[in-house]
Structure formats: structure tokens, C-alpha cells
Amino acid sequence: MSVKVEKKTDSYLKDTIQKLLERSRESGSVFWRDIAIRLSSSRKNYATVNLGKLQRIASDDDIIVIPGYLLSSGVFNKKIKVSAFKISEKALKKLNDAGSEFVNLVDLASENPKGTNIKIIR
């Protein structure tokens, strides 16, 4: 399956996909390639996750990747590390108030090149 980056018009998205593919090739991990493939698909297929869903699914100290958008609906009070393509301002504020951490996808790929102990939420 090829990754069609050239069809994307958003430069931030193109850059993110290319950097995730580079990390995947460098580390030999298919995890970051899978995230890049999900981001290279149509936007209607992106994951849209609310904080309320993370509250139900995640445990404290989990590392969560969302190949799409993180929105602020719901109550949230867990201490986790979250990474997503985009996050709303309210969701970021709720995460910080709960003591959680938001990390860019590319930065998380640099921290954890193999993608071990990371959950993908859709």
C-alpha cells in the first residue's frame, strides 16, 4: 500500500506524514507507518475523539495516539500522554488542567521510535 502524500494540500499534514514515514524507515517500525497511512487517507476517515471517550478507555500513565482530531466534549481527569494530528484549544486546556501532557505526533515518534506501549484510539 503506497502513501499518497503528494495529493494533500495542507503543508503541515504533508510534513507530518513524511516525517512519520522517515521515523518508520529509520527504526524499522510499522507502527508509525500505520499512523502515516491513516493520515494520508481521506479526512472523513480521520478519527475524531472526545475527551470523554479517553476518560472511559485510558488508564493513568497510558500513551495514546489519535490519528485525527481530539475534541473537548466530556469530563476528563486522568494523567496520560496524548498525541494527535490536531487538538482543539478547549481540549488542550482540559488536558493541562488534569495534569496530562499533549505531544506532537512527530515529537512522540522521536521519543518512541518503535512505538512500544502506545495505544491507538479511533
From Swiss-Prot:
Q: List the Gene Ontology MF annotations in alphabetical order.
A: RNA binding; structural constituent of ribosome
Residue stretches in coiled coil: none
Which cellular components does GO assign to this protein?
cytosolic large ribosomal subunit
Looking up InterPro entries in the UniProt record yields: Ribosomal_eL18, Ribosomal_eL18/eL18-A/B/_CS, Ribosomal_eL18_arc, Ribosomal_uL15/eL18, Ribosomal_uL15/eL18_sf
Looking at the record's lineage, which domain of life comes first? Archaea
Listed A to Z, the keywords are: Ribonucleoprotein, Ribosomal protein
Any Pfam family: Ribosomal_L18
Q: Which family does it belong to?
A: Belongs to the eukaryotic ribosomal protein eL18 family.
HAMAP family to which the protein is assigned, alphabetical = Ribosomal_eL18 (MF_00329)
Q: What is this protein called?
A: Large ribosomal subunit protein eL18
